[in-house]
Every structure is written in structure tokens, then in C-alpha cells.
Amino acid sequence: MSSSNYDVKTGNFLCGFDKFPPEKETDKNRGLTEGFTEIISMAGVPGTIEIASGYYIEASLINQLIQIIGVDVFIKSYFFNLGTKFLESKLLNIIADPELAFQLFRNIEINFQIRNLKGKQSLLGNIQLLLLDYLEKRCEKLIENNKLREVNEILKIYEQMLITPEKLKIMDKNPDDYEGLVESITKFKNLQEKLSPKLVNIEAQDSVRK
């Protein structure tokens, strides 16, 4: 754990998305804590080679989530030790399924716990696939409100944050062990193709503003 503080009143140790001892499942998520701590660290040290980070996968998943619910939500949850409940509430505004949001964060935590596991595994691929469901709904809502440029920027950034087989090779991991990962990349490309006809009016919007 990269940092922590002790709450004298409650007798709990607090750190990012974690509370010790935890009272409920949403009180603990070391995967999120380490991932967001890594993002903060890399932001503070320009030139850091991100893919060399020990928590690159966790940071990448969080960066995907940031494009969906915003960085301010993470900052508040992290520094005020809110667990994952606040994050879940924001996801419910996109897809109204509490179990889906809960399971997403459980999977991120479990994926962190088994990060050194060798052999076939499907959690990482499933997480990226699920995040893309949220991304699609988020983009559709923005398009409904004619926020085309915002959607365009989100898709550009999101593509850079995807965990790909090529990145896993650089991390000395076998991409063939990560079931569902290739499918998640394909799903993102299909989403790009689906939304691209709706984004052709961005230049027209800019002309109107001028």
C-alpha cells in the first residue's frame, strides 16, 4: 500500500479506496487504490514510462473509467476514502444495474489479486468488455445532447488506454492467456465504426460557432 492514514475516532486505517478493517465489500479495493496512486505519481513525474509501471493494468482500467465517469469522481472517492459506492452511483446514471456496477469493481479487485497468476484467465478481458458497455451508453447520451466533440475526444483517449496484446507482450505476459482481450479490442473498434457517422457533423458545429 502506497500511503495510509489512521482515523483515531473509528480506529480504521484509511487509504484511497480501502478501509481496514472493512465493514463491507465496498470498503476495500486495493486494485483501485494502487492504480489511482500510480496515475497520480506518473502525473507528478513527467517522462515516466507508463508501461514499465508495476500497476500499469490497474492504472489503465481506471483511465478507461475516468473517460466514462470523470476524474473528479475518482479524486473525491480516493482522497475522502469513500470506497467504491460513489463510483458505483455514477455508473448507475449510465446503466441502472447496481449488481453490474458492484461486480465491475469486485472483478477489478480480484484481477489485481491474481495479477501474477500464470495460465488462462478471463477477468481482464471481461472487465474491458463490461467497461465498453458503459462507454457506449455514455457516448450515446452525449450524442443525444449534441456533445459530439466531447465524444470524439473520449474515443481518442480511450483507445490509448485499452490494454492490448501488444502491451501485454511488452510486460512479458502471454496475450494468449487473456481470454476475451482480443474481443474487447474488436468491440471498441466496432463502437468507433458505429458512432463515426454521428460524429461527422463536428466540423459543421464548429462552423456554426464561428
Model region roles, listed by residue range:
Residues 6, 10-69:
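Post-HExxH zinc-binding segment in Zn-dependent metallohydrolases
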Residues 52-207:
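Pan-zinc metallopeptidase signature
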Residues 1-5:
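Short alpha-helix carrying the canonical HExxH Zn2+-binding catalytic motif
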